[in-house]
A protein has these predicted regions:
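A general structural signal for well-ordered alpha-helical segments in protein cores
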Residues: 27, 60, 64, 89, ...
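Short glycine-/small-residue-rich flexible loop motifs, especially phosphate/cofactor-binding loops
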Residues: 93, 124, 195, 259, ...
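Generic structural "secondary-structure junction" signal
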Residues: 14-18, 54-55, 113, 141, ...
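Alpha-helical structural signal in soluble globular domains
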Residues: 62, 66-71, 95, 99, ...
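Catalytic alpha/beta core domains of metabolic enzymes, predominantly
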Residues: 128, 142-249
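Active-site beta->alpha loop and helix N-cap motifs at the rims of alpha/beta catalytic domains
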Residues: 2-146
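C-terminal alpha-helical cap/extension of soluble enzyme domains
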Residues: 4-14, 33-40, 200-203, 210-301
């Protein structure tokens, strides 16, 4: 299978005003920035970092329309169409396809904790309901369900399920999925602190939230590791980037820190929507120091 999707994709933030209304103008401008200046190969609105769970159906549709309009076909837009039931997710997925999405990002339904067999039937129904590629999103830390390699192998037999974003944090998963599935499914790194390891094991892409704040560094790391196979140079850059990635993943406030980092790097995207809150002064000060250290470490590189 030739890969339609590869490279660095943003798990796109959803900009908000100070009143926690979706800021569609900033969303369009930010999407354009990520493509034109950041050099990203794709965008994914309505993922975890995009706070899809906090948006109304009308807002979700408007976010997709705004992102597609801003992108104007320059890069693929995969839309997160997650929800609580198969019926609801099919409706979101069909809507995204109709609006012009290039693909879908699908996690396990939240809260209900379906079994592997129930998950297979769930994803098969979605697969049969749409005609665009599906990227599975395995993030048991958020869904409570781990889509293990044997289930991924079964799902890879379905026509539209062609990718998986692997976010377990298990360093063996990328190689195990590739060993089992071969060319039937392509793996995207979904755990920032295992990015280089994932690329060395055969991942063809990277979906990240921190990429919103540091797009050029992410793209450069991917180029060094995947395009150039220059793992020595990639490792040097990766070790400089790791303190930022580790802080974001380990703080327990991922979306909050990503939005704060965007503002610190000159692209304010507003606060998260409650119940999430903007980071406090102490956290913001620490984040600012980490970002400044990274800037100094890569200056001139």
């Amino acid at each position: 299978m030739d890969s339609l999707f590869e490279g660095v994709y943003s798990a796109l933030v959803t900009p908000m005003t100070v009143d926690e209304e979706v800021d569609y103008q900033t969303l369009g401008e930010f999407a354009n920035y990520l493509i034109e200046e950041g050099g990203l190969q794709g965008l994914i609105p309505l993922g975890s970092t995009g706070e899809y769970y906090a948006l109304s159906d009308q807002e979700r549709e408007a976010v997709v329309k705004t992102t597609l309009a801003a992108t104007a076909g320059r890069v693929p837009v995969l839309v997160g169409t997650n929800g609580g039931s198969t019926r609801q997710i099919i409706a979101y997925s069909r809507q995204a396809e109709t609006l012009g999405a290039a693909g879908l990002l699908l996690a396990a339904p939240y809260y209900s904790l379906p079994t592997p067999d129930e998950l297979y039937r769930h994803f098969k129904r979605i697969n049969d309901a749409v005609g665009i590629p599906i990227m599975l999103y395995n993030y048991p830390g958020r869904t409570g369900v781990d889509m293990k390699p044997d289930l991924i192998e079964r799902l890879a037999e379905l026509d539209n399920i062609q990718y998986v974003k692997e976010s377990t944090g298990d360093a063996t998963r990328v190689s195990e999925i590739i060993r089992r599935c071969g060319e039937q499914i392509k793996v995207f790194c979904g755990c920032d602190t295992l990015a280089l390891e994932s690329f060395m094991m055969g991942a063809v892409g990277w979906v990240g939230g921190v990429v919103n704040a540091l797009p050029k560094a992410h793209v450069r790391l991917f180029e060094l590791a995947v395009d150039n196979k220059d793992f020595m140079a990639a490792r040097k850059l990766y070790y400089k980037l790791l303190p930022v990635l580790s802080l974001m993943e380990g703080a327990g406030q991922y979306t909050q820190f990503v939005k704060a980092a965007c503002a610190m790097n000159g692209h304010p995207v507003g606060p998260p929507r409650r119940p999430l809150c903007a980071v406090g002064d102490e956290e913001a000060s620490h984040l600012k120091k980490i970002l400044a250290s990274f800037d100094m470490a890569v200056s001139g590189v």
